[in-house]
């Protein structure tokens, strides 16, 4: 997200200074802004997106609302764990390298299965990366950061 990217130098400095309280605050703000942006933006797009496209004379439309909302959720979870991974990598740790590769392989396999075997079309394209990331990445890195900040805060 733009906010997270703009504070990356502060995150690196706080990591170097072992300022867990500042890191905790930056993480909470980053995730809060991320979720707020997705919720507000998602609602606006779902309710007024096609109207806006018609207003500018576009011949295209957004995906049906259910697909759009699922796609936004998959993307929100992806951005959430990417933000957490950024906080981890600011400490010169990259534990997510191999899991990222495995998620990529899982996504390709699921895409093939959903598109070639189940013929799910666009749903398959939305759900394949969502399922592949949900297995591990979506929860592992955010929980690692939350655990780190809670343990250090309460010690």
Feature-to-residue mapping (PLM):
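Helix-loop junctions and terminal segments of transmembrane helices
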Residues: 1-18, 90
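Hydrophobic residues within alpha-helical transmembrane segments
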Residues: 33-36, 70-73, 101-102, 131
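Interhelical loop/hinge segments that connect adjacent transmembrane helices in multipass membrane
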Residues: 18-22, 146-155
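Membrane-interface junctions at transmembrane-helix termini in multi-pass inner-membrane proteins
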Residues: 69, 73-100
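Membrane-interface helix-loop junctions in multi-pass transport and translocation proteins
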Residues: 49, 53-54, 63-66, 95, ...
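Membrane-water interface segments that mark the loop-to-transmembrane alpha-helix transition
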Residues: 16-42
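Interfacial segments at transmembrane-helix termini and the short loops linking adjacent helices
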Residues: 20-24, 46-76
């Amino acid at each position: 997200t733009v906010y997270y990217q703009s504070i990356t130098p502060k995150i690196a400095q706080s990591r170097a200074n072992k300022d867990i309280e500042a890191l905790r605050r930056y993480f909470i703000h980053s995730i809060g802004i991320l979720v707020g942006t997705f919720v507000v933006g998602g609602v606006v797009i779902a309710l007024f997106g096609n109207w806006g496209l018609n207003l500018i004379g576009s011949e295209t439309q957004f995906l049906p609302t259910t697909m759009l909302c699922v796609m936004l959720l998959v993307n929100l979870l992806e951005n959430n764990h990417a933000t957490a991974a950024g906080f981890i990598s600011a400490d010169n740790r990259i534990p997510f390298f191999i899991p990222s590769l495995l998620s990529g392989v899982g996504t390709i396999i699921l895409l093939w299965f959903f598109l070639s075997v189940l013929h799910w079309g666009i749903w398959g394209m939305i759900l394949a990366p969502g399922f592949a990331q949900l297995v591990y990445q979506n929860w592992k890195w955010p929980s690692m950061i939350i655990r780190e900040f809670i343990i250090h805060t309460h010690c």
